[in-house]
Amino acid sequence: MIVIEKVDKTPVVKRLVEIVERKGQGHPDYIADGISEWVSRYLSRYYLEHFGIILHHNVDKTLVVGGQAAPRFGGGEVLQPIYILVSGRATYEVRTKDGVIKVPLGTLVMQAARDWIKQHFRFLDPDTHVVIDYKIGQGSADLVGIYDLGVKSVPLANDTSVGVGYAPLTPLEQLVYKTERLLNSRDFKAKYPEVGEDVKVMGVRVGKEVKLTVAAAMISKLVKDKSHYLSVKEDVKKAVEDLASKVAPEYNIEVVVNAADKPEHGIFYLTVTGTSAEHGDDGMTGRGNRANGLITPMRSMSLEAAAGKNPVSHVGKIYNVVAQRIADKVYNQVKDIIEVYVEIVSQIGKPINEPKILNVEIIKSGELTGEVRNEVEAIAREEIEKITQITDYILRGEVSLY
């Protein structure tokens, strides 16, 4: 059932207060999300390559337990490694007409986790700074039976869940997202290699006044002394201020970098590896960014952890992606839309292209005419009809999940 309604509420951009957060690439929660998702992708590709279908799995319960480190200007060492536990459930043996085939679960999990760390960090060594472990409930599958049921049919929802999307992003939401992406960009790291990957951004707006708090871990061995640290910190601040002047010129923006620093007491945000996980900061899948890459308490949000869930039938993942696609298309293609929210609810056991309800909330100028309703409904139906394509987008890394 598709419901389209005009709602009478103040758009976020016009509210007095707005709060937006993003946990960046090296944050412990982001690490958990990233590893969960890569394990799912490695499993999915293995299943596809060897059995022609993606078999059941959900690995959306990764835990990152902080280690201990002793950073110092010009050096430092990791004293106790970060402990990463990947948990969930996956198919580990498959019965075929030729016999039982075992899936190398452990090898795939370890390889996925190591590869993710290597690709997203420059100074975190997955072999010496991290202990990777896994506790995955093991299931089996009857491939002959699966084919008899028809693997090409529309998957059935394996949960009763909700996915949420909205559009457009406010200037503050864009600024928070782009700030983290800037500081973790290849160009910025080439210019300022001292800046680590653990970047967290919190934006608070009251009227036209914005305070942007940026926590950026610094790489201790690349920072020779206090003055060097403060110089890089000032360069980070200026870079963010320059970005802010382009993304949100209508606001008065104050940028604060590493607010917990107390130089007079020798307290600086230094890390050996580039992540706060090296010294007691823990993380877990689903505790960080929502599927659009932001934490937005002023918006409707799903609390589902999209990362690590199977990309075929788990609506906690798929519906968040589809809801965002519908919201973006409605905002971009339908005239006079100010804001749009989309909520999609599944019913366990039903085909994923038959949601229990697909609700579209519209804030717009003027009336919600029959023509507008038809346009919105056509967009929603098209995306739901194409829902099985989402799996490929996810496996190719073409959609935001965290």
From Swiss-Prot:
Q: Name one Pfam family in it.
A: AdoMet_Synthase
Keyword Hydrolase: yes or no?
no
The pathway to which it is assigned is: Amino-acid biosynthesis; S-adenosyl-L-methionine biosynthesis; S-adenosyl-L-methionine from L-methionine: step 1/1
* Source superkingdom: Archaea
EC top class named in words: transferase
Essential cofactor(s): Mg(2+)
Provide the catalytic activity annotation: L-methionine + ATP + H2O = S-adenosyl-L-methionine + phosphate + diphosphate
Q: Which residues bind ATP?
A: 137-142
Role, per record: Catalyzes the formation of S-adenosylmethionine from methionine and ATP.
The molecule here is called: S-adenosylmethionine synthase
Per the UniProt entry, what species is this protein from, by scientific name?
A: Pyrobaculum islandicum (strain DSM 4184 / JCM 9189 / GEO3)
User: What is the organism lineage in this UniProt record?
Assistant: Archaea, Thermoproteota, Thermoprotei, Thermoproteales, Thermoproteaceae
